[in-house]
């Protein structure tokens, strides 16, 4: 009975009138569900182990979002925060479908600063709720995770305090979870209030983010090799900066540690099945854009093509593209089979493993998303 009431209350939260005045927003794609998930992450010195864990598990979290709603457009964002006097107070990374770009930004974050105990939690929440480009509309799923170990500075006169920010979040249809690293009592009091006012979950985890479970499978090596082949079908095009970004993504995928590489491949495989065979996130892959009908080959300027295509006659260009399309289709089909086998094996191994002594950051987030996205 209590569970039904809780779910009904949460559902009621999402259908309240949404207020957007004064806030940046994106426009929903007609007829397509949208799931937006942002993290407000403390990046002061004490959060180092958790941040490093987040870098390793961001792809499993992204996969959990896709698995909870396979038909949705997925957008993720991040607000990193420290305190006044540190290198930065907040650093905003906009909500985006380009998860590889978000991953690249996450890799650049380092845990530093935060000499006194409280941090600029109020400002960070305010930036996340009012400055990120949440999609406008009543049928959008918007979820925020506050992740930190220290309470907010309540003595900063210029800040909008968290109770008011959470009222704005409610008006905008943003559900707010509070993930507490460590066991500080003053933080717990605030984090519980944040979760209650935000209609989310209070989630306590160990200071280091908990034990991140990595299950090796017999399919991992082949998945990594196959992803390298798939990335070889990418043809960067467009302005020089865009081509450089695409090349960086394929190099970054190749350089990722094996556990990260396999989870990244799992997400990208799911994404390819949901799109026109896209194998990187974001713009700039000519093969994907031609297949999706977003681009025509004869409309691309020569100076926006890679050297391999620029020096080819028009007929040879088309033949080369067709070959890449066919190769990608075959490789993506093989990858989908391998990922399914890997997921099945990992699930069976997880069932056999002893229950962890404490929750971990990635499991806690995935568990919350599995419920909240389906409301």
Regions found by a protein language model. Give the residues of each.
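Divalent cation-coordinating acidic motifs and surrounding scaffolds
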Residues: 21-213, 217-218, 289-302, 308-310, ...
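Eukaryote-biased recognition of electropositive, low-complexity segments
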Residues: 162-166, 172-176, 184-291
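Bacterial N-terminal signal peptides
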Residues: 8-20
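N-terminal secretory signal peptides that target proteins for export/translocation
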Residues: 1-5
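A general alpha-helix detector
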Residues: 304-305, 316
């Amino acid at each position: 009975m209590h569970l039904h009431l809780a779910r009904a209350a949460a559902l009621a939260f999402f259908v309240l009138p949404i207020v957007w005045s004064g806030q940046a927003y994106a426009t929903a794609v007609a007829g397509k569900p949208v799931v937006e998930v942002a993290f407000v992450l403390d990046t002061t010195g004490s959060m180092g182990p958790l941040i490093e864990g987040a870098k390793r598990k961001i792809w499993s979290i992204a996969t959990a979002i896709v698995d909870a709603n396979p038909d949705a457009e997925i957008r993720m964002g991040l607000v990193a925060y420290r305190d006044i006097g540190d290198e930065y107070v907040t650093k905003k990374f906009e909500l985006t479908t380009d998860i590889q770009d978000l991953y690249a930004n996450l890799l650049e974050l380092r845990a530093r600063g935060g000499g006194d105990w409280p941090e600029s939690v109020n400002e960070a929440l305010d930036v996340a709720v009012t400055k990120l480009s949440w999609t406008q509309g009543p049928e959008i799923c918007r979820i925020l995770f506050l992740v930190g170990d220290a309470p907010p500075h309540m003595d900063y006169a210029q800040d909008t305090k968290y109770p008011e920010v959470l009222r704005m979040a409610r008006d905008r249809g943003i559900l707010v979870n509070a993930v507490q690293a460590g066991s500080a009592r003053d933080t717990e009091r605030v984090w519980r209030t944040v979760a209650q006012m935000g209609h989310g979950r209070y989630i306590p985890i160990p200071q280091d983010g908990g034990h991140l479970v990595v299950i090796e499978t017999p399919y991992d090596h082949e998945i990594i090799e196959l992803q390298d082949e798939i990335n070889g079908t990418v043809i960067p095009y467009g302005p020089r900066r865009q081509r450089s970004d695409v090349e960086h993504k394929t190099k970054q995928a190749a350089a990722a540690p094996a556990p990260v590489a396999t989870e990244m491949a799992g997400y990208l495989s799911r994404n390819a099945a949901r799109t026109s065979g896209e194998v990187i996130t974001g713009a700039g892959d000519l093969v994907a854009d031609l297949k999706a009908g977003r681009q025509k080959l004869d409309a691309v300027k020569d100076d926006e093509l890679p050297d391999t295509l620029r020096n080819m006659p028009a007929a040879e260009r088309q033949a080369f593209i067709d070959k890449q399309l066919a190769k990608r289709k075959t490789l993506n089909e093989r990858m989908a089979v391998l990922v399914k086998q890997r997921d099945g094996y990992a699930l069976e191994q997880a069932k056999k493993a002893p229950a962890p002594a404490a929750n971990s950051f990635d499991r806690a987030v995935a568990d919350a998303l599995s419920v909240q996205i389906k409301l």
